Amino acid sequence: FHDGSDEVPLFDRDGTRQLELNLIWLNKVCEFAKKHNKIPIFWDDMPLKHAGVYKPMFNDKISKKEVDDIWEKNEVSLMKFIEKFPKNAIYMRWNYQKSNTYGNQKAMDWYTENGLNVMGATAGQTRWTLMPQNQSNISQIKSFAVNSIEKKLEGLLLTLWDDDSPHFELYKRGIAAFGQFAWSGDKESIDEFKTIYRHRTYGSKFSNNEFAFIDKLENPVGLWLNMLLSKEGWRPGLSKKKDPIVTDIIELPDLNNKGLWSKKYSEKIKNANESLLISNEVEQIINYLLNNNSKNKYTLEVYNQVNELVKFSAKAILALEKLDISQTVDQIDYKKTSLKEIKDLQNEFDYLRINFEKTYSKTRILNKPDYYILDQDHHSHPANQTINFDWQFLSEILFLKKLKNLDNHEKL
């Protein structure tokens, strides 16, 4: 029985402190779960946060002595109410990026030393957009799995968060890694696991590093996130902005100030070139797999659509650079070519979106019903920003709208 009260704010009330209030609630839930023959599972944030020992779990820069000092000072707050900690619950010690910190290990040990059941919770997907990254978080999955085995804990949980809604096909390598290391511990290295994964997923002919396209794709996807945005732009919040085309979308070249845009956005241009180079390599690998009888073709098709979307943004930046530079070159044909590339972006995107939606819709419902209630609070979960599938392409859609306002095209 999963209780999700970890994000509920608490305030002191009638002389009762936050930690004690949280424990009162946990005990009520545990009594309810026991009556229904269920085992309650809690995220353990609140007790540790209210006691002041929370931050060291996520800080790998502080020394063991500093962590011990924090615990020596604040553990008394936990021990004051130790008898009120429910014994029939599992305390879920989540840590998705820093599971091997001394602070995290110390917190887990505290539970077991005080007769409480604790499990670790790692993640195959957190808040990455478009696809899981950090090599599917495999290093963290392995670290937490090995630590849990060494501590003889009863189990380990793999979370797969949908806050940013990548396609579920792209979660599968992280799930496989969790199975591998949770069941087998430290028997294989991460590189050995990746070889095994390629073998089992695509076929024995495709197990070597020549076909390791997933890790390659991570960098272009990371660059894609803000490729078409201004410095202040934020993709998840675009739908809530008053005028995102002005505030969040990258500015366009000023045709009266030749070359200025390219100088200002030299870093984006560099990133776009780098991204496109890698994406072209990824495209070749995926196409080879698709054309040579690999297994799990649908997974490859989804990765291919991710790569196509990433390529579009990089190409758009390079097209703007070409337009900006073409103003400094006395070649009419070159200018006409750069202008045509800009005008063709809308058609390229329309074609891309048709194929993207065709692939994703095989296993995903893209459009919500008209009565669906979108985000109304401070959260900005991408898929909850529009009724239709526009949320996946908001940066691209707004960028293309802005592009239509580019003045003086015909004067080139």
Range-by-range predicted roles:
Residues 1-6:
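Aromatic-residue-lined binding/catalytic grooves and analogous aromatic/hydrophobic interfacial grooves
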